[in-house]
């Protein structure tokens, strides 16, 4: 399943607020569909699937990528769910979003893909790069790149930069100063249900 490129508000009407996907709120309260979806008791599978979809759409990863992250999270010490969230939070496109360089994760991914972002002084155009403690994320030294980011950083997608990131706003740089704790994840998600969803599939 490839990355979603359709209407974003349709997704948030179904899954709820996804801060990484869009800053807009739908004026419609009913779920998508001709008449909305009939209210009925959802199965445990449907609930787990919905939580998994929240992760996919918020962070903008494909099903194949998410499976890889789940496998990697399992192989690490500690809680698989927390490890999974940490891996997604450490993606370069997400770090740029959390620093305010882009208004959304898709917007931040575009900055990375178009060569506007540097890691430790070198241009890096890999959105899924896993940022490490000590990495310095910056903006390429040219007018066009800086202008793009200066407009975003004045009105960031999220109000606060999480404590594991240090933002130097005048220099348009950010530094990773540690691990992302669970409570600093902006998405409202039950990651344990995601782990359960993949328990028999991966």
Swiss-Prot record:
CDD domains, alphabetized: S4
Designated name of the protein: Small ribosomal subunit protein uS4
A single GO molecular function term of this UniProt record: rRNA binding
Species per Swiss-Prot/TrEMBL record: Prochlorococcus marinus (strain MIT 9301)
Designated gene of the protein: rpsD
Family to which this protein belongs: Belongs to the universal ribosomal protein uS4 family.
SUPFAM superfamilies: Alpha-L RNA-binding motif
Residue spans crossing the bilayer: none
GO biological process: ribosomal small subunit biogenesis; translation
Assigned GO CC terms: small ribosomal subunit
């Amino acid at each position: 399943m490839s990355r979603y490129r359709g209407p974003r508000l349709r997704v948030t009407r179904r899954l709820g607020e996804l801060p990484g996907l869009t800053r807009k709120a739908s004026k419609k309260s009913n779920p998508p569909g001709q008449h909305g979806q009939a209210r009925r008791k959802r199965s445990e599978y449907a609930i787990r699937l919905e939580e998994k979809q929240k992760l996919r759409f918020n962070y903008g990863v494909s099903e194949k990528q998410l499976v890889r992250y789940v496998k990697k999270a399992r192989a690490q010490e500690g809680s698989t769910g927390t490890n999974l969230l940490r891996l997604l939070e450490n993606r370069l496109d997400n770090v740029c979003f959390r620093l305010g360089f882009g208004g959304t994760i898709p917007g931040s991914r575009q900055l990375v893909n178009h060569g506007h972002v540097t890691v430790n002084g070198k241009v890096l155009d890999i959105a899924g790069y896993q940022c490490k403690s000590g990495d310095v994320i910056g903006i390429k030294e040219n007018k066009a790149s800086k202008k793009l980011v200066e407009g975003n950083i004045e009105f960031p997608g999220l109000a606060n930069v999480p404590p594991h990131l240090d933002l130097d706003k005048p220099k348009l740089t950010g530094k990773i100063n540690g691990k992302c704790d669970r409570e600093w994840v902006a998405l409202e998600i039950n990651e344990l249900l995601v782990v359960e969803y993949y328990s028999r599939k991966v």
